[in-house]
Protein backbone atom coordinates (compact mmCIF):
# COMPACT_ATOMS: atom_id res chain seq x y z
CA UNK A 1 0.00 0.00 0.00
CA UNK A 2 2.80 2.43 0.92
CA UNK A 3 4.46 1.76 -2.44
CA UNK A 4 1.19 2.46 -4.27
CA UNK A 5 0.72 5.73 -2.38
CA UNK A 6 4.28 6.66 -3.26
CA UNK A 7 3.55 6.11 -6.95
CA UNK A 8 0.55 8.41 -6.73
CA UNK A 9 2.44 11.07 -4.79
CA UNK A 10 5.07 11.02 -7.51
CA UNK A 11 2.41 11.57 -10.16
CA UNK A 12 0.77 14.48 -8.35
CA UNK A 13 2.21 18.01 -8.23
CA UNK A 14 3.73 18.99 -4.87
CA UNK A 15 4.82 22.52 -3.97
CA UNK A 16 7.42 21.48 -1.41
CA UNK A 17 9.24 18.96 -3.60
CA UNK A 18 11.16 19.12 -6.87
CA UNK A 19 8.88 19.22 -9.93
CA UNK A 20 8.08 15.85 -11.48
CA UNK A 21 8.85 15.23 -15.15
CA UNK A 22 6.99 12.32 -16.71
CA UNK A 23 8.87 10.21 -19.25
CA UNK A 24 6.91 7.66 -21.30
CA UNK A 25 8.94 4.75 -22.64
CA UNK A 26 7.26 2.88 -25.50
CA UNK A 27 8.63 -0.67 -25.37
CA UNK A 28 8.54 -2.57 -28.66
CA UNK A 29 5.79 -5.19 -28.91
CA UNK A 30 8.35 -7.90 -29.70
CA UNK A 31 10.56 -7.00 -26.72
CA UNK A 32 10.80 -9.31 -23.71
CA UNK A 33 13.25 -7.13 -21.79
CA UNK A 34 12.53 -6.44 -18.12
CA UNK A 35 11.09 -3.02 -17.36
CA UNK A 36 13.72 -2.36 -14.70
CA UNK A 37 16.52 -2.96 -17.23
CA UNK A 38 14.84 -0.58 -19.66
CA UNK A 39 14.42 2.07 -16.97
CA UNK A 40 18.10 1.80 -16.09
CA UNK A 41 19.15 2.41 -19.71
CA UNK A 42 16.67 5.27 -20.12
CA UNK A 43 18.03 7.00 -17.01
CA UNK A 44 21.52 6.81 -18.54
CA UNK A 45 20.10 8.42 -21.69
CA UNK A 46 18.49 11.22 -19.67
CA UNK A 47 21.68 11.80 -17.69
CA UNK A 48 23.38 12.82 -20.95
CA UNK A 49 20.79 15.56 -21.52
CA UNK A 50 20.76 18.04 -18.65
CA UNK A 51 18.45 20.58 -20.30
CA UNK A 52 15.48 19.92 -22.58
CA UNK A 53 13.07 22.44 -24.05
CA UNK A 54 9.47 21.46 -23.33
CA UNK A 55 8.18 18.10 -24.49
CA UNK A 56 10.88 16.07 -26.24
CA UNK A 57 11.03 12.71 -28.01
CA UNK A 58 13.84 10.28 -28.89
CA UNK A 59 13.16 7.81 -31.72
CA UNK A 60 16.76 6.71 -32.37
CA UNK A 61 19.31 5.45 -29.85
CA UNK A 62 23.06 4.87 -29.75
CA UNK A 63 22.60 2.28 -27.02
CA UNK A 64 22.07 -1.12 -28.75
CA UNK A 65 19.87 -2.33 -25.87
CA UNK A 66 17.49 0.63 -26.26
CA UNK A 67 17.53 0.34 -30.06
CA UNK A 68 16.44 -3.31 -29.83
CA UNK A 69 13.79 -2.91 -27.16
CA UNK A 70 12.44 0.64 -27.23
CA UNK A 71 10.37 2.37 -29.90
CA UNK A 72 10.56 5.83 -28.35
CA UNK A 73 11.33 7.78 -25.18
CA UNK A 74 9.17 10.87 -24.65
CA UNK A 75 9.25 13.67 -22.10
CA UNK A 76 5.54 14.49 -21.95
CA UNK A 77 2.93 16.86 -20.58
CA UNK A 78 5.35 19.62 -19.59
CA UNK A 79 3.26 22.08 -21.61
CA UNK A 80 -0.17 21.30 -20.16
CA UNK A 81 -0.11 24.23 -17.72
CA UNK A 82 2.05 26.71 -19.63
CA UNK A 83 1.41 28.44 -22.94
CA UNK A 84 4.83 27.79 -24.41
CA UNK A 85 7.68 25.28 -24.04
CA UNK A 86 10.03 26.08 -21.18
CA UNK A 87 13.64 24.94 -20.59
CA UNK A 88 13.69 22.07 -18.08
CA UNK A 89 16.68 21.17 -15.92
CA UNK A 90 16.28 17.40 -15.63
CA UNK A 91 18.87 17.27 -12.86
CA UNK A 92 16.64 19.41 -10.64
CA UNK A 93 13.52 17.34 -11.31
CA UNK A 94 12.08 14.07 -10.09
CA UNK A 95 11.96 11.74 -13.09
CA UNK A 96 8.92 9.44 -13.27
CA UNK A 97 9.48 6.69 -15.84
CA UNK A 98 6.48 4.89 -17.34
CA UNK A 99 7.33 1.85 -19.48
CA UNK A 100 4.49 0.42 -21.57
CA UNK A 101 3.72 -1.91 -24.47
CA UNK A 102 0.75 -1.34 -26.76
CA UNK A 103 -2.03 -3.89 -27.10
CA UNK A 104 -2.53 -4.58 -30.81
CA UNK A 105 -5.73 -6.62 -30.40
CA UNK A 106 -8.32 -3.93 -31.12
CA UNK A 107 -11.78 -3.70 -29.52
CA UNK A 108 -14.07 -6.61 -28.73
CA UNK A 109 -17.85 -6.45 -28.37
CA UNK A 110 -19.82 -7.08 -25.22
CA UNK A 111 -23.21 -8.53 -26.12
CA UNK A 112 -26.39 -9.03 -24.12
CA UNK A 113 -28.74 -11.89 -24.91
CA UNK A 114 -32.34 -10.97 -25.63
CA UNK A 115 -35.19 -13.27 -26.55
CA UNK A 116 -34.95 -12.62 -30.28
CA UNK A 117 -31.34 -11.50 -30.82
CA UNK A 118 -28.04 -10.52 -29.24
CA UNK A 119 -27.55 -6.78 -28.75
CA UNK A 120 -24.11 -5.17 -28.81
CA UNK A 121 -24.19 -3.23 -25.57
CA UNK A 122 -20.56 -2.14 -25.27
CA UNK A 123 -17.11 -2.10 -26.87
CA UNK A 124 -14.13 -3.29 -24.84
CA UNK A 125 -10.43 -2.36 -25.17
CA UNK A 126 -7.42 -3.59 -23.22
CA UNK A 127 -5.18 -0.58 -22.53
CA UNK A 128 -2.81 0.84 -23.52
CA UNK A 129 -4.23 0.20 -27.00
CA UNK A 130 -2.41 0.78 -30.29
CA UNK A 131 -5.63 2.36 -31.59
CA UNK A 132 -5.34 5.25 -29.11
CA UNK A 133 -1.59 5.82 -29.39
CA UNK A 134 -0.94 9.53 -30.06
CA UNK A 135 -4.58 10.49 -29.45
CA UNK A 136 -3.81 12.51 -26.29
CA UNK A 137 -1.28 14.73 -28.08
CA UNK A 138 -3.64 15.34 -31.02
CA UNK A 139 -6.27 16.96 -28.79
CA UNK A 140 -5.76 20.71 -28.40
CA UNK A 141 -7.67 22.88 -25.92
CA UNK A 142 -7.38 26.50 -24.80
CA UNK A 143 -7.84 25.93 -21.09
CA UNK A 144 -6.09 23.42 -18.84
CA UNK A 145 -8.68 20.71 -19.49
CA UNK A 146 -6.25 17.82 -19.83
CA UNK A 147 -4.17 18.70 -16.78
CA UNK A 148 -7.31 19.18 -14.65
CA UNK A 149 -8.64 15.76 -15.64
CA UNK A 150 -5.31 14.08 -14.92
CA UNK A 151 -5.03 15.76 -11.53
CA UNK A 152 -8.63 14.87 -10.66
CA UNK A 153 -8.20 11.14 -11.26
CA UNK A 154 -4.83 11.03 -9.51
CA UNK A 155 -6.36 12.77 -6.48
CA UNK A 156 -9.29 10.35 -6.52
CA UNK A 157 -6.95 7.37 -6.34
CA UNK A 158 -4.78 8.99 -3.67
CA UNK A 159 -7.80 9.71 -1.43
CA UNK A 160 -8.91 6.09 -1.83
CA UNK A 161 -5.49 4.74 -0.88
CA UNK A 162 -5.32 7.03 2.15
CA UNK A 163 -8.77 5.77 3.25
CA UNK A 164 -10.25 9.27 3.38
CA UNK A 165 -13.78 8.98 4.79
CA UNK A 166 -16.08 9.57 1.79
CA UNK A 167 -18.91 10.50 4.17
CA UNK A 168 -16.90 13.53 5.26
CA UNK A 169 -15.26 14.36 1.92
CA UNK A 170 -17.34 13.16 -1.01
CA UNK A 171 -16.10 12.08 -4.41
CA UNK A 172 -17.80 9.78 -6.90
CA UNK A 173 -15.18 8.95 -9.56
CA UNK A 174 -17.53 10.38 -12.21
CA UNK A 175 -16.42 12.83 -14.93
CA UNK A 176 -18.90 14.60 -17.24
CA UNK A 177 -17.69 16.30 -20.43
CA UNK A 178 -20.39 18.32 -22.18
CA UNK A 179 -20.54 20.59 -25.21
CA UNK A 180 -21.47 20.66 -28.91
CA UNK A 181 -20.82 17.66 -31.20
CA UNK A 182 -17.41 17.25 -32.80
CA UNK A 183 -15.38 18.90 -30.04
CA UNK A 184 -13.49 15.75 -29.07
CA UNK A 185 -15.28 14.76 -25.86
CA UNK A 186 -15.35 11.03 -26.56
CA UNK A 187 -11.80 11.08 -27.93
CA UNK A 188 -10.64 12.91 -24.80
CA UNK A 189 -12.22 10.25 -22.58
CA UNK A 190 -10.44 7.48 -24.48
CA UNK A 191 -7.16 9.40 -24.50
CA UNK A 192 -7.46 10.05 -20.76
CA UNK A 193 -8.00 6.35 -20.07
CA UNK A 194 -4.93 5.52 -22.16
CA UNK A 195 -2.81 8.21 -20.51
CA UNK A 196 -3.74 7.13 -16.97
CA UNK A 197 -3.09 3.47 -17.75
CA UNK A 198 0.44 4.43 -18.82
CA UNK A 199 0.90 6.90 -15.94
CA UNK A 200 -0.05 4.21 -13.40
CA UNK A 201 1.67 1.28 -15.11
CA UNK A 202 3.79 0.57 -12.03
CA UNK A 203 0.61 0.04 -10.01
CA UNK A 204 -1.83 -1.56 -12.47
CA UNK A 205 -0.69 -4.17 -14.98
CA UNK A 206 -3.14 -2.96 -17.64
CA UNK A 207 -6.27 -0.91 -18.21
CA UNK A 208 -9.77 -1.87 -19.31
CA UNK A 209 -12.02 0.53 -21.24
CA UNK A 210 -15.70 -0.32 -21.61
CA UNK A 211 -17.67 2.03 -23.89
CA UNK A 212 -21.38 1.54 -23.25
CA UNK A 213 -23.73 1.92 -26.21
CA UNK A 214 -26.39 4.18 -24.69
CA UNK A 215 -28.76 3.77 -27.63
CA UNK A 216 -28.74 -0.02 -27.30
CA UNK A 217 -29.78 0.29 -23.68
CA UNK A 218 -33.06 1.84 -24.75
CA UNK A 219 -33.72 -0.42 -27.71
CA UNK A 220 -37.38 -1.13 -28.37
CA UNK A 221 -36.49 -4.83 -28.37
CA UNK A 222 -35.57 -4.78 -24.69
CA UNK A 223 -38.59 -6.29 -23.00
CA UNK A 224 -36.66 -6.65 -19.74
CA UNK A 225 -34.13 -3.87 -20.13
CA UNK A 226 -33.47 -3.36 -16.44
CA UNK A 227 -32.36 -6.96 -16.00
CA UNK A 228 -30.16 -6.78 -19.09
CA UNK A 229 -28.47 -3.62 -17.86
CA UNK A 230 -27.76 -5.39 -14.59
CA UNK A 231 -26.20 -8.26 -16.57
CA UNK A 232 -23.98 -5.85 -18.47
CA UNK A 233 -22.76 -4.16 -15.31
CA UNK A 234 -22.10 -7.56 -13.79
CA UNK A 235 -19.60 -8.09 -16.62
CA UNK A 236 -18.05 -4.75 -15.71
CA UNK A 237 -17.98 -5.81 -12.05
CA UNK A 238 -16.02 -8.92 -13.07
CA UNK A 239 -13.38 -6.64 -14.61
CA UNK A 240 -13.29 -4.41 -11.53
CA UNK A 241 -12.73 -7.44 -9.30
CA UNK A 242 -9.32 -7.84 -10.93
CA UNK A 243 -7.30 -5.45 -8.77
CA UNK A 244 -4.40 -5.54 -11.27
CA UNK A 245 -6.62 -3.65 -13.73
CA UNK A 246 -7.61 0.02 -13.86
CA UNK A 247 -11.15 0.06 -15.27
CA UNK A 248 -12.74 2.95 -17.19
CA UNK A 249 -16.47 2.92 -17.96
CA UNK A 250 -17.37 5.34 -20.78
CA UNK A 251 -21.02 6.28 -21.27
CA UNK A 252 -21.30 8.33 -24.46
CA UNK A 253 -24.24 10.70 -25.02
CA UNK A 254 -25.46 10.29 -21.47
CA UNK A 255 -28.38 12.62 -22.24
CA UNK A 256 -30.08 9.47 -23.58
CA UNK A 257 -30.77 8.64 -19.93
CA UNK A 258 -32.54 11.96 -19.48
CA UNK A 259 -34.53 11.60 -22.68
CA UNK A 260 -35.85 8.22 -21.59
CA UNK A 261 -36.74 9.41 -18.08
CA UNK A 262 -38.51 12.57 -19.27
CA UNK A 263 -40.37 10.75 -22.04
CA UNK A 264 -41.61 8.23 -19.51
CA UNK A 265 -42.86 10.99 -17.23
CA UNK A 266 -44.68 12.53 -20.20
CA UNK A 267 -46.28 9.20 -20.99
CA UNK A 268 -44.64 8.78 -24.42
CA UNK A 269 -42.32 5.92 -23.41
CA UNK A 270 -43.13 2.64 -21.64
CA UNK A 271 -42.32 2.30 -17.96
CA UNK A 272 -39.56 -0.11 -19.01
CA UNK A 273 -37.53 2.92 -20.12
CA UNK A 274 -37.50 4.43 -16.65
CA UNK A 275 -36.43 1.07 -15.24
CA UNK A 276 -33.42 1.12 -17.56
CA UNK A 277 -32.46 4.62 -16.40
CA UNK A 278 -32.80 3.74 -12.75
CA UNK A 279 -30.87 0.51 -13.28
CA UNK A 280 -27.97 2.39 -14.87
CA UNK A 281 -27.84 4.98 -12.07
CA UNK A 282 -28.02 2.26 -9.42
CA UNK A 283 -25.22 0.30 -11.05
CA UNK A 284 -23.05 3.43 -11.30
CA UNK A 285 -23.56 4.00 -7.58
CA UNK A 286 -22.43 0.44 -6.89
CA UNK A 287 -19.29 0.30 -9.02
CA UNK A 288 -18.02 3.76 -8.03
CA UNK A 289 -17.24 2.36 -4.56
CA UNK A 290 -14.25 0.52 -5.97
CA UNK A 291 -10.91 2.33 -5.99
CA UNK A 292 -9.82 0.99 -9.41
CA UNK A 293 -12.72 2.34 -11.48
CA UNK A 294 -13.34 5.71 -13.15
CA UNK A 295 -16.64 6.58 -14.88
CA UNK A 296 -16.32 8.88 -17.91
CA UNK A 297 -19.42 10.39 -19.53
CA UNK A 298 -20.18 12.78 -22.38
CA UNK A 299 -23.18 14.81 -23.48
CA UNK A 300 -23.90 16.86 -26.59
CA UNK A 301 -26.94 18.61 -25.08
CA UNK A 302 -26.11 20.19 -21.75
CA UNK A 303 -29.68 21.29 -20.93
CA UNK A 304 -31.00 17.73 -21.20
CA UNK A 305 -28.66 16.13 -18.68
CA UNK A 306 -30.60 14.64 -15.79
CA UNK A 307 -30.11 16.43 -12.47
CA UNK A 308 -29.78 13.06 -10.74
CA UNK A 309 -26.83 12.28 -12.94
CA UNK A 310 -25.25 15.74 -12.81
CA UNK A 311 -25.18 15.49 -9.02
CA UNK A 312 -23.07 12.34 -9.33
CA UNK A 313 -20.38 14.04 -11.43
CA UNK A 314 -17.35 15.42 -9.57
CA UNK A 315 -16.09 17.30 -12.63
CA UNK A 316 -18.45 18.90 -15.14
CA UNK A 317 -16.20 20.24 -17.87
CA UNK A 318 -17.50 22.17 -20.86
CA UNK A 319 -15.70 21.36 -24.12
CA UNK A 320 -16.38 24.02 -26.75
CA UNK A 321 -15.16 24.70 -30.29
CA UNK A 322 -11.44 25.59 -30.45
CA UNK A 323 -10.29 29.21 -30.52
CA UNK A 324 -8.10 30.64 -33.27
CA UNK A 325 -5.01 29.91 -31.15
CA UNK A 326 -6.00 26.27 -30.69
CA UNK A 327 -6.87 25.98 -34.39
CA UNK A 328 -3.40 27.29 -35.26
CA UNK A 329 -1.84 24.50 -33.18
CA UNK A 330 -4.10 21.90 -34.82
CA UNK A 331 -3.20 23.07 -38.34
CA UNK A 332 0.48 23.28 -37.40
CA UNK A 333 0.48 19.64 -36.29
CA UNK A 334 -1.23 18.65 -39.57
CA UNK A 335 1.36 20.51 -41.64
CA UNK A 336 4.22 18.91 -39.68
CA UNK A 337 2.79 15.47 -40.41
CA UNK A 338 2.43 16.20 -44.14
CA UNK A 339 5.99 17.54 -44.28
CA UNK A 340 7.25 14.44 -42.46
CA UNK A 341 5.49 12.26 -45.06
CA UNK A 342 6.87 14.52 -47.86
CA UNK A 343 3.43 15.31 -49.26
CA UNK A 344 4.38 18.92 -48.52
CA UNK A 345 7.89 19.36 -49.93
CA UNK A 346 10.38 20.88 -49.37
CA UNK A 347 10.15 21.16 -45.60
CA UNK A 348 9.97 24.71 -44.27
CA UNK A 349 10.10 25.97 -40.71
CA UNK A 350 6.90 27.56 -39.41
CA UNK A 351 6.82 29.90 -36.43
CA UNK A 352 4.59 29.28 -33.43
CA UNK A 353 2.05 31.87 -32.31
CA UNK A 354 4.34 32.78 -29.42
CA UNK A 355 7.20 33.44 -31.83
CA UNK A 356 4.91 35.57 -34.00
CA UNK A 357 3.92 37.57 -30.91
CA UNK A 358 7.58 38.12 -30.02
CA UNK A 359 8.25 39.76 -33.41
CA UNK A 360 5.03 41.76 -33.23
CA UNK A 361 3.41 39.85 -36.13
CA UNK A 362 5.67 41.73 -38.55
CA UNK A 363 5.71 40.18 -42.01
CA UNK A 364 9.07 39.14 -43.47
CA UNK A 365 10.49 36.17 -45.36
CA UNK A 366 10.62 34.09 -42.16
CA UNK A 367 7.15 34.92 -40.84
CA UNK A 368 5.14 35.20 -44.07
CA UNK A 369 3.83 31.62 -44.19
CA UNK A 370 3.12 31.49 -40.46
CA UNK A 371 1.12 34.72 -40.69
CA UNK A 372 -0.91 33.21 -43.53
CA UNK A 373 -1.61 30.17 -41.38
CA UNK A 374 -2.67 32.47 -38.54
CA UNK A 375 -5.10 34.23 -40.88
CA UNK A 376 -6.57 30.89 -42.02
CA UNK A 377 -6.92 29.87 -38.36
CA UNK A 378 -8.88 33.00 -37.53
CA UNK A 379 -11.35 32.48 -40.34
CA UNK A 380 -11.76 28.83 -39.29
CA UNK A 381 -13.27 29.80 -35.93
CA UNK A 382 -16.63 28.11 -35.43
CA UNK A 383 -15.55 24.80 -36.96
CA UNK A 384 -15.29 21.78 -34.69
CA UNK A 385 -12.07 19.93 -34.02
CA UNK A 386 -13.46 16.96 -35.94
CA UNK A 387 -13.93 19.09 -39.07
CA UNK A 388 -10.58 20.85 -38.67
CA UNK A 389 -8.71 17.53 -38.71
CA UNK A 390 -10.46 16.60 -41.98
CA UNK A 391 -9.74 19.86 -43.79
CA UNK A 392 -6.09 19.13 -44.77
CA UNK A 393 -7.27 15.93 -46.47
CA UNK A 394 -10.12 17.75 -48.22
CA UNK A 395 -7.78 20.56 -49.26
CA UNK A 396 -5.51 18.06 -50.99
CA UNK A 397 -8.34 16.04 -52.54
CA UNK A 398 -10.24 19.04 -53.90
CA UNK A 399 -7.54 21.52 -54.85
CA UNK A 400 -4.16 19.78 -55.19
CA UNK A 401 -4.44 16.19 -56.47
CA UNK A 402 -0.67 15.77 -56.84
CA UNK A 403 1.90 13.62 -55.01
CA UNK A 404 3.73 16.64 -53.62
CA UNK A 405 2.97 20.31 -53.10
CA UNK A 406 4.82 23.30 -51.69
CA UNK A 407 3.68 24.68 -48.37
CA UNK A 408 2.56 27.87 -50.13
CA UNK A 409 0.35 25.84 -52.45
CA UNK A 410 -1.04 23.80 -49.60
CA UNK A 411 -1.95 26.84 -47.51
CA UNK A 412 -3.82 28.31 -50.48
CA UNK A 413 -5.73 25.04 -50.86
CA UNK A 414 -6.46 24.92 -47.13
CA UNK A 415 -7.87 28.44 -47.25
CA UNK A 416 -10.19 27.43 -50.10
CA UNK A 417 -11.28 24.32 -48.20
CA UNK A 418 -12.22 26.45 -45.18
CA UNK A 419 -14.28 28.79 -47.39
CA UNK A 420 -16.04 25.80 -48.96
CA UNK A 421 -16.84 24.35 -45.54
CA UNK A 422 -18.64 27.51 -44.45
CA UNK A 423 -20.46 27.74 -47.80
CA UNK A 424 -21.76 24.19 -47.38
CA UNK A 425 -22.87 24.90 -43.82
CA UNK A 426 -24.75 27.97 -45.02
CA UNK A 427 -26.52 25.95 -47.73
CA UNK A 428 -27.46 23.23 -45.26
CA UNK A 429 -28.87 25.71 -42.75
CA UNK A 430 -30.95 27.41 -45.46
CA UNK A 431 -32.51 24.06 -46.37
CA UNK A 432 -33.62 23.33 -42.82
Swiss-Prot record:
Belongs to the AAA ATPase family. PCH2 subfamily. The modification N-acetylmethionine is found at residue 1. GO terms for molecular function: ATP binding; ATP hydrolysis activity; identical protein binding. Specifically interacts with the ligand binding domain of the thyroid receptor (TR). This interaction does not require the presence of thyroid hormone for its interaction. Interacts with proteasome subunit PSMA8; to participate in meiosis progression during spermatogenesis. GO terms for biological process: double-strand break repair; female meiosis I; male meiosis I; meiotic recombination checkpoint signaling; mitotic spindle assembly checkpoint signaling; oocyte maturation; oogenesis; reciprocal meiotic recombination. InterPro entries: AAA+_ATPase (IPR003593), ATPase_AAA_core (IPR003959), ATPase_AAA_CS (IPR003960), ClpA/B (IPR001270), P-loop_NTPase (IPR027417), Pch2-like (IPR044539). It comes from Canis lupus familiaris. Plays a key role in chromosome recombination and chromosome structure development during meiosis. Required at early steps in meiotic recombination that leads to non-crossovers pathways. Also needed for efficient completion of homologous synapsis by influencing crossover distribution along the chromosomes affecting both crossovers and non-crossovers pathways. Also required for development of higher-order chromosome structures and is needed for synaptonemal-complex formation. In males, required for efficient synapsis of the sex chromosomes and for sex body formation. It comes from the Eukaryota. This is Pachytene checkpoint protein 2 homolog. ATP binds at residues 179-186. Gene3D superfamilies: P-loop containing nucleotide triphosphate hydrolases. PANTHER family: PACHYTENE CHECKPOINT PROTEIN 2 (PTHR45991), PACHYTENE CHECKPOINT PROTEIN 2 HOMOLOG (PTHR45991:SF1). The keyword Ribonucleoprotein does not apply. Keywords: Acetylation, ATP-binding, Differentiation, Meiosis, Nucleotide-binding, Oogenesis, Spermatogenesis. SMART domains: AAA (SM00382). The keyword ATP-binding applies. GO terms for cellular component: chromosome; male germ cell nucleus; nucleus.
Amino acid sequence: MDEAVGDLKQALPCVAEAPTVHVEVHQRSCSTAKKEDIKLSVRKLLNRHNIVFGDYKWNEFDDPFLARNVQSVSIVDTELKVKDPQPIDLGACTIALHVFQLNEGGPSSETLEEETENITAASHWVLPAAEFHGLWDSLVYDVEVKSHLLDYVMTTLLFSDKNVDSNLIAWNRVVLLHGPPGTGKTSLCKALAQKLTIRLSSRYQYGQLIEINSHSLFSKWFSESGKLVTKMFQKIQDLIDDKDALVFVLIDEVESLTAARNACRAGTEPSDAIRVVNAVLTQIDQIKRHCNVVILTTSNITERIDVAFVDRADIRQYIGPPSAAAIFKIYLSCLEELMKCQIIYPRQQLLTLRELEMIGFIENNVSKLSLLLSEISRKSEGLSGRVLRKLPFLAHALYIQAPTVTIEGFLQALSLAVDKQFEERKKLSSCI
